[in-house]
Each structure stands twice: as structure tokens, then as C-alpha cells.
């Protein structure tokens, strides 16, 4: 007989009551530890479509016109569970698309419509995205019908396009190609506030000084897409709001004319909802009970739909005909005097001092009822700010011009984070090249393997060092951002302003190398771009360094890069791509509040690197002597220019200890003699101190992995060089 005491039966096996939410995480226990999660997100294991699925290939089999027809039919197919205002869902779908794209910020390229992230926290539950869950549910039958051929990300933007077209606007076009993600993004910093819609000046405020908005943020409050429609911190003052608008839209890569067009065009159709008490609404989607099935803000206390809907708390339409594309917004805004009032939900808004009944929009359910139109504080800024007023009057006097500017601005808003035109898919892609798409000329030459070998030989015989070739190729490619697919080596914009003058590109060294490449180019019998020469030069240098380490390897090189011109380059829009740090070259422009290793992690994520790829690249770049300015920090080798695993061997060798010599400065000292052997920075030390990174470093330090280190470095190097070669994907 078993004498062990009987176990309790029928009880929850998890004494804390939850499998996923209880207990402290490693980050809770060690909040200052380097968190590598941003490099481990979007793993293929979380993608239900599998490793072999190609969205681009699937999209090319999509009947795009059939989708557009279905979307157009949906616009007026009102559902009882969420009825359409005036029988037309256009305003709702436009707001959904606007808010999907409008989270983009140019500083780091993150946010935006490119991933379908509105389906996940925190965006799906932001106060500013209230009731957009209903819009996505209305789209579900269409998504279900077309399946894998049409991503949620593409569908949401296309729905916004078709909403405008169904109401009379000729849109500029549509490009598909946005691939869905399958869980929330971990790399996007939305702010450090601890509550939604926190006013400036409190804990974790995104503002400092007079009203300096923290980089890289664009929105003025946690949980808003852009500005507070009631005014700065909820206090109406159109001129103050205008300043917020100008800053926010500039950080979304929009100028004043585009800003007015987007504001007016967004409010030409649809309405705001605040005819009720927000206290009657249930929790947001992430906090809602399981029976709500992912829907939030559900009103179980009052009717809560149709004319009784509460979303932003602001109530009313902006124009007389809210389901028709016309010039009614400017007619209403400019031809009436406005006074402050509060909506039934208690939100600040503006109403006309007087208005003719026939100019009032009708009720969303009963056309015999006329309703008072509204303007938000942001709308009033379009009238009261002098520059915005000039643009508004121009648009009012020329409706065709307004429609054209808006259509182009809407296309830019919804496609800015899709990247260069080479990534666009579908029959509705506009033929015109736009400067914000960072166009690059198509090359008209090919190179054989013999041609490539000849180029490598010429470059190695040019007198340029391994370090110079590696650093130049790296600097050209490192600007790539997987967030909005900008930057990279294609186009060789490192030759042009502003990149040629960036401090991080070491202008003197850069001009020397470019001069040599220009000489090689002029002496060739075949056409080759400088962009290709820069990359093949890096490949030649890496091959030589590998040979010197005893490993014969060919660095794959795919020709086909063009050389962009100044006319194809918007210098101002490239300013946010300027590196102010690069841990791969052991450089920071100045002392920042953020630790250098955190900045390295951020750059690696933007470049699309995994943690092992980041590790092997740093170790290789150090021994190649590719540090900024020839710095010796982290160069743990006596064989500079040789692609050895010495960085990892010496990093993990207990014969040495590390001693601080400054805030970001260390000496490596021999334990037995006290002799200083090498110098280092935090970016070097972190590969020995962080437990995860050390595990990778130990792999590359092993005696049996010297060749593996070289091969892994080459693979990661080629990934960086080809990151913007969308034609190779």
C-alpha cells in the first residue's frame, strides 16, 4: 500500500490562480538588465502561415478589383449590431485607416500601417482608437473570403481608400505588400506615462522645457494618434493647438499644406461620437471579459449605438453632407463664427454662433432631424493660425486643387512606412515616382562572376585598407531601417548631402574612399555603380580578412544597385536617419542618458538583426579595425585586419579583469601582472556581462568554432548589405 499522503483533487494546480500573469518576470527582478526581447520578436514560430509562405506571391494572385467591389458594397451594408451613420460606413473606415497609418513617426520609422498592429495591444485599446474594433469586425467577412492573399494591414488601408472613392474622391492609388505581425510589437516606445491621456508635466511626461516633445514620439499624449482635439492638455486654445499640430505632423513627415489637407479631408466626411455618458462604456478590448470576444467599450447600460454612440466624447459632423466628398469643410469652417461649448459627453468643442437650418447635417438615423455641426480645437487651428489659414483659403477657393493635394497626402500618409516603390504590389500602384519614396535609378548592366572577381582584385590593389573598405560599406548600409524600409546601401546616398557630411560617416575618410572608387569606376570598360563598388569593396575586404585567418570563403555579392541623384533625394527627410551612435563601430556622438548598449540594441533591431547576428557582427567589426576614428576600444587582438575570433576569446578569458577608467571607458588588465592589455567600452563589456550575450560569445570563443565564426559573420554581413535589395527577396 502506498503510504504517501493523498494529493488534493479538484483544486487548481496553479496556487497563484494564473498561468501567465502572476509572479515577477526577470525584467521585474532586474529592471536595469539589457532586455533582448526586441530582437527575439516576430519569430517564425509565432507565424501560423509557416516558413514557406510568401505574402508577395499570394497577393499577386489576388483579384484586387473584386476586393474593391466587395468593400464598396460593404460601405452601405449597415449591420444592426453596429449601424452605419447615415447608412454609410465610410467615415468609420477612414478613421480606422487614418489611425492605422497615423501612428508613424519619421524619427525611427516605427508605428504606421505596415504591420496591421492596430489589431494588438496597446493600439487596439488606445482611447483614440475607440470603436475601431467594430470597423475591423465589419471587415472580417472580406478578410475571411480572401484569406492569406490579403493581409489585415493591406485590407485596413484599402478599406480607407474605398471609403473615399465611394463618397466621390478620386484617390491617388494603392500599393499592397504590408505583411501582418502576429503579436504586439516590443520595440516601439510609445512613451513612459503610466496612464492614458496623462497631461504634460506629470510623472513620465513626454514634454520638457517650454514644450519640447521627447524623441522619437510624435503624438502629444499616451493613447492619442496625434493631438488632443479638445486642446493642449484638454484646454481649448486653437493657437496653442496649432503649435502641437505643426510639431506632430512634422514628426509624421508632413508639411503645412499636407497637414491642412489631411485635417480637412479627414473631417470632410463622417462624424465624432459623444452623445451619451462615457461612464456607461465597458473596458477596452484588452481588458474586456472573454464573452465580449475581443470587443471593447461595450455599452450594456444604455442603447449605445447609432446616434447614441460614445467614442471620443466629441459629438457631431463637420459638414452638411458627411457622406459626400466636397468642399463643405472649408465652407463650414471659414463662413461661420464659432464659440466654445461642451458635448453631451462633456468634451470641449466648438459650435457655430449662428447657422441656417439647411446648412446643418441631418441626424444619422432620422433625416427629418437637423443637428448642430462641430469643429474641434484642431479644426479651429486651421482657421486661426495664420499659415494654416492661408492654405485653408487656397483650398476653399480651388476645390480641385484641394482634392489633388489631399489625395496625394492621403497616399503618402498610408504608404510612408511601406518603403520604396519596389515593395509596392498590385495594379493600382501609381506610375509616378515620388521623392519621399527615396527613388533609385534602375541599373541597366549585369556583372559576371569573372567581372566581380576582377572588381575585387582592383579594389584590393587600390591601396585602401581592410578597415577603410569595411567601414565605408558598413556606413552606407547601416542606415537601413526595417521599420519603414528606408536607408541602406542602394542608391549610394552616402555620396550626397546630407549623408556625406554626417559626423558618423567620417567625411574625410569617406571622401578618400569615394575618390578611389570614382577612379576605379572611370577606368572600367563596363558600367558599374558607385553603390555596387562600395558593397563589393566591403566584400573583398572581408574575404581578404578571412583568408588571412585561414578560412577561404566567398562573400556573396549581388550587383544591381543604382546611384541616386540629388534631385531624387529629399535631404531634409534623411536627417532623421543620421546615426548619433553605432555600437558596431564603437561610437557615440556624445554622452546620452541612454546607455550605449541599449542604443546598440535599438540599432540592431532597426536593421533587422537577431541577437546572434548582432553578436557576431560586433566581434568581427572589432578585429577588422573598423571602429570609428580608428579607436582601439574593443580591439582585443594583435592581428588587426584578420577575421579571427580573438574578440570573443579574449573577452571570455579569465586571465583578464575589467577596470573602469571613466563613465564609458574600461581597461582590460592582466590579473597576474596588472598590465593594461586593451581598452573597451560598455558595448564591448556587455557581451561578457549579459548572460544571454555571453552564451553567444562563448560559442564563438570555442576552439572548434573559429570557422563557424567567419561563416556566420559573412552571412550576417551580407544580410546587412542586402537589407534594402527588395528585388532579391
UniProtKB/Swiss-Prot annotation:
PTM notes: Formation of the three residue Trp-Tyr-Met cross-link is important for the catalase, but not the peroxidase activity of the enzyme.
Cystine bridges: none
CC cofactor note: Binds 1 heme b (iron(II)-protoporphyrin IX) group per dimer.
Swiss-Prot/TrEMBL cofactor(s): heme b
Pfam families with a match to the protein in the record: peroxidase
Crosslink position(s): Tryptophyl-tyrosyl-methioninium (Trp-Tyr) (with M-252): 98-226
Domain of life of the source: Bacteria
Keyword Heme: yes
Residues joined by cross-link Tryptophyl-tyrosyl-methioninium (Tyr-Met) (with W-98): 226-252
Sites where the protein binds heme b: 267
Biological process per Gene Ontology, one example term: hydrogen peroxide catabolic process
GO CC annotation terms, alphabetical: cytosol
Catalytic activity: H2O2 + AH2 = A + 2 H2O; 2 H2O2 = O2 + 2 H2O
UniProt-annotated catalytic positions: 99
Matches recorded under InterPro entries: Catalase_peroxidase, Haem_peroxidase, Haem_peroxidase_sf, Peroxidases_AS
Molecular-function annotations in GO: catalase activity; heme binding; metal ion binding
Gene3D superfamilies found in the cross-reference section: 1.10.520.10, Peroxidase, domain 2
E.C. number(s) listed in UniProt: 1.11.1.21
Keywords tagged on the record: Heme, Hydrogen peroxide, Iron, Metal-binding, Oxidoreductase, Peroxidase
Site (Transition state stabilizer): 95
Family: Belongs to the peroxidase family. Peroxidase/catalase subfamily.
Assembly and interaction partners: Homodimer or homotetramer.
Function: Bifunctional enzyme with both catalase and broad-spectrum peroxidase activity.
Protein name: Catalase-peroxidase 1
Natural source organism: Cellvibrio japonicus (strain Ueda107) (Pseudomonas fluorescens subsp. cellulosa)
